[in-house]
UniProtKB/Swiss-Prot annotation:
GO terms for molecular function: potassium channel regulator activity; serine-type endopeptidase inhibitor activity; toxin activity. This is Kunitz-type proteinase inhibitor AEPI-III. The keyword Cell cycle does not apply. The keyword ATP-binding does not apply. It comes from Actinia equina (Beadlet anemone). It is found in: Secreted; Nematocyst.
Length: 35
């Protein structure tokens, strides 16, 4: 999926938004929290 090509950028706000990035070491998409 195209969203898996995005880097894991955490952000600087108080939001809590689940996002995904492609972890090249693990070889799969992984979830992180943006906010």
């Amino acid at each position: 999926n195209s969203f898996c090509n995005l880097p894991a950028v955490v952000g600087r706000c108080k939001g809590y938004f689940p996002r995904y990035f492609y972890n090249t070491e693990a070889g799969k998409c992984q979830r992180f929290i943006y906010g």
